[in-house]
Amino acid sequence: GIRCNFDVGDGVISRFGFDTETEDFDKVVEFVKETSNVYLVNLQCHFAKRNVEFWGARAKGMLDVTDRVASILGYVPDRIDLGGGIFGNMEKDLKRQFGSPIPEYKDYAKAAATLFAERFPDKKPELLVEPGSALAGDSMKFVGRVESIKNVRGKQFVTMLGSQKNISMAGINPPMKIFKNGVNRT
């Protein structure tokens, strides 16, 4: 497969994938065309922003890339993978921290899959998404020991034994229950 990188208007420039507007991308597609034992099965993209408004641009971009690749190769790849970057189930306290409504899975489908259904009514190619953390994000609990609590200009900071990967560094805090000596203090 080929991972594609193009502008979806989210303000993020990713280092991953081939920029579809460059000679490097064209060279990869030409390599596939000229190599008899290579068949392109998958075109893939992945973008960081989870906002549903970028999913229409993601789908349109992949449709444009698919059309371009198909015109060169003479076939549409078997799969188009729109990657991940989907909000999952979350508690109301967490949702409120994002400042905009959290989309449901059907909102992403409407924004992206509708365009593919219109373009490919025979249901080929297969359309994939990678929900990853959207499905697993609310399935576990982080437990750690509090090492210190301090107040800086009216804001409390808690230092725990754990990884920064377990607690957001972006100021988005997962719902918390605080226990002291086995007693819920929330």
Predicted regions and their residues:
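Short secondary-structure boundary segments
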Residues: 15-17, 21-25, 103, 107-108, ...
